[in-house]
Amino acid sequence: MKFQANRDVFSEAVSFAVKLLPQRTTLPILSGVLIETTDTGLQLSSFDYEVSAQTQIAAEVEEPGRVLVSGRLLAEIAAKLPNAPVQFSTEESKIVVRAGSANFTLLSMPVEEYPSIPQVDGEAGLVPAEEFAEAVAQVGVAASRDDVTPVITGVQLEVGNNTLGLVATDRYRVAVREIDWDNGTTSGEAQTALVPARTLTEIGKTFGHSGTVSISITNRDDRELIAFTADKKTVTSLLIKGNFPPVRRLFPEQVDNYAVINTAELIEATRRVSLVLEREAALRYTFTADGLTLEAIGSEQAQASESIDALLTGQETVVSLKPQFLLDGLGAVHSEFVRISFTKTENPNKPGPVLITSQTSKDQSGSDSYKYLLQPNLLLR
């Protein structure tokens, strides 16, 4: 096997191929990247039985072949090569990588033992890449990081005729985003896919500037897969098995008690006042006709408070919220103002979830395509 490729193109391809590989694996062979020659250049692939990545690039191929090499090591080498064409060749069980005056010799891995890369050829729909990446970032923050309950470590994709919904929860909060969807299926049936949040987050970052992203869901050999394709790059992922909780029903249809606040001011005030708090403590937010007051009591008698402008509609309200959870929602709103709506429970002494949505101005509500529901901490009275 022998080829020559552009250094930047080759480095980016290797980096993409290994990005989703686990840091540690019980099977060393799964840490490799598979390089194969094609009629038009090269195909680079990786697979750990759960996630695969595959990309194609142009190259001048002198001798066809396929080889398996340590992925992360090759990625580090490719990123540090001098600005010159990459010359790649195999000599028995060794791989030689040259660029300019830099030379590297690596051992190849047993390519015949490498598993087959999954191929997804089902019907696909299209989403705008930038909007999809934004939606993934907005919703992904609410996904659980506790592997004890795998079903909530994912983001639920809900496919409709013209929209794609993304939903995530960690039991303490729920995030929902709707985006436009060009449904490529002939059946028109609604579909759902529960994708690991970590994988989906990396996919969003990778394909964020790709124009459009093709998404297809398929069932092969009793394995449910989802595939994302753009710019000659494809990522597949096994879906999480289990029933995602029906969290959409938690969102109220209408709320008459809410406050409108400048988003940046609320973020900065929350960051300042929370400085005195212990790690898991909550901040007290008091909403009145005069505005919003933030209060915190920390250890060693440390205290902090701050008041900012807020336009309140409805009755005065006091809630306690974990600052980081609130900041995650505020950071995802992407509007100058934010609306914080206060829901009710059957117990008048127990505040209901707080709903965060965008607000175009103090007087005009924004798009409801993104919603973030946050469960308040019960106040100790």
Model-found features: residue ranges?
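Structural preference for solvent-exposed beta-strand-turn elements
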Residues: 1-381
